[in-house]
């Protein structure tokens, strides 16, 4: 998700905690966390689950997400994988 120099992760933690708390408070958020990969220091992974596409869209448009992007936007982003778990086989 996000590649941060390991010596800068600690300064980013308060912003991560704020993003986590605000995202979890969204009505359409089922699960949300940001975590540093223990095997790769500086790699911040996001794990997010939303009720539906509208909830994901609302998250992306939220003020707290925009604030997180303003702080984290300076760091390179890795590829991401989106899974649609709403469809039944």
Language-model features and meaning:
Residues 1-3, 33-60:
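Short, well-ordered beta-strand segments in beta-rich or mixed alpha/beta enzyme
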Residues 1, 63, 88-89:
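Short flexible/disordered coil segments
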Residues 33-42, 68-89:
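Glycine-rich beta-strand-turn "strand-cap" elements at beta-sheet edges
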Residues 8-30, 64-68:
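Short amphipathic alpha-helical segments
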Residues 15, 35, 59-62, 71:
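Residue-level signal for well-ordered alpha-helical positions
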